[in-house]
Amino acid sequence: MKIGIKVLGCPKNEADCDVLEAILKDRGHEIVSDIEEAEAVIIDTCGFIESAKKESIDEIITFANYKKYRPFFLCVKGCLVQRYSKELSKEIPEVDSWLGVLSPHQIAEAIEKATPYLVEKPTVVYEEAPRSCNNSFAYVKIADGCDRSCTFCSIPLFKGRFKSRSIESIYSEVERLVEIGVKEIILVAQDTTAYGVDLYNKAVLDQLLKKLNSIEGNFRIRVMYLHPDHLTDKMIDAICSLDKLLPYFDIPVQHGSDRILKQMGRIKNSEQLLELIAYIRSHNPDAAIRTSVMVGFPGETNDDFQKLLDFLEKAKFDRLGCFIYSDEEGTVSSSMKRKVSERIARERYENLLIFQSQIAYERLKRFVGKNLNVLIEQENELFYVARSHLDAPEVDGEVTVKKTREVDIPGYYTVRITDSDEYDLKGELI
């Protein structure tokens, strides 16, 4: 069967679908990039925040409408289905199969059997599985689910308890990816700092990193989703000292007002977060620190928002993502009073991004005149397009490299940085 896969949402979905693609190929199916050729289409959805849910629903409706002109088997899976399967199945009857948060093996079997509906206790963590990857980088999921108690977050409601994969399983997957030519391994989970607590009775992310660092090959490792409340000195030391680890810290602090942080269910206050950032930079001044923040949380005042801006001024994050709060069914914050209007939340969002852009510009300027090791991934007639340790795929910037000689793509090269703006760097091959 010719199968097309449409992935929405976070990198964890991409990791699952890469595994699913490999399983389907092993079972004799053909994966097609042109949906017009597909006999079956799988849509992997996101159910985290309002904008992501809307994107998923719009995509489902688009494909449901396609069926008016050409018959094919339409399967919708993932987080949105896990949360709203009954409502969705009633509203969009054109979908042939609704599958919740299941392992890639279960998904493959359900599609082959044309299972119309399968939503049960989440079972996304897998040990041994084949692996497919069509990029120079690959997401590797080391755990799923979450045991944290952030008041705004619905993920534990549909992902379930935190579940780690074994070190051996992850090592085997990374080794296979390196063997097929992947140059950057990106470790993901809802909270990578919690890795191992359920299997080894303690967090062992640092041990996992040391094990993966021993794999032979010319590749690098990036770690995403480091919860600031549980990021330890050992973890920081491992990321800063191991030669295959990129000095990149993705630390979602969420806010800078102590009052709002407390209402969010976070543990560390703004001063402790600044101490964490200072500790990282004391180990590697050029380490990239990325964060995510939220505006419009219930009860957020002008003073709270100003404290967030003051915090960002002190923290000087290299990269930042900002979200506007939305009520999520079943969360503690959804029942909180003193909601912030959409207009005010949008104003704060736009003002924050403008404010942060100047910080990012000043941070990137420090690399002009320096040499950086970059991964060249694309080319045109005049330039190569690359990423440095500062740049996670899809969410950060890039390095534009003047084309002065032929190089292997993908490949690592040393580049002298010649210019910068708020998000991107320019450079020349050495």
UniProtKB/Swiss-Prot annotation:
Domain MTTase N-terminal: 1-116
Binding residues for [4Fe-4S] cluster 1: C10, C46, C79
Localization per Swiss-Prot or TrEMBL: Cytoplasm
Cofactor annotation remark: Binds 2 [4Fe-4S] clusters. One cluster is coordinated with 3 cysteines and an exchangeable S-adenosyl-L-methionine.
Domain TRAM: 365-430
Binding locations of [4Fe-4S] cluster 2: C146, C150, C153
GO molecular function: 4 iron, 4 sulfur cluster binding; aspartic acid methylthiotransferase activity; metal ion binding; protein methylthiotransferase activity
Enzyme class per UniProt: transferase
Recorded catalytic activity of this chain's protein: L-aspartate(89)-[ribosomal protein uS12]-hydrogen + (sulfur carrier)-SH + AH2 + 2 S-adenosyl-L-methionine = 3-methylsulfanyl-L-aspartate(89)-[ribosomal protein uS12]-hydrogen + (sulfur carrier)-H + 5'-deoxyadenosine + L-methionine + A + S-adenosyl-L-homocysteine + 2 H(+)
GO biological process: tRNA modification
A Pfam family assignment: TRAM_2
PROSITE patterns found in the cross-reference section: MTTASE_N, MTTASE_RADICAL, RADICAL_SAM
Stretches assigned to the Radical SAM core domain: 132-362
Enzyme Commission number: 2.8.4.4
Cofactor(s) listed: [4Fe-4S] cluster
Gene Ontology CC terms: cytosol
Domain of life: Bacteria
PANTHER family, per the entry: RIBOSOMAL PROTEIN S12 METHYLTHIOTRANSFERASE RIMO, RIBOSOMAL PROTEIN US12 METHYLTHIOTRANSFERASE RIMO
Its biological purpose: Catalyzes the methylthiolation of an aspartic acid residue of ribosomal protein uS12.
Family: Belongs to the methylthiotransferase family. RimO subfamily.
Protein name: Ribosomal protein uS12 methylthiotransferase RimO
Gene coding for it: rimO
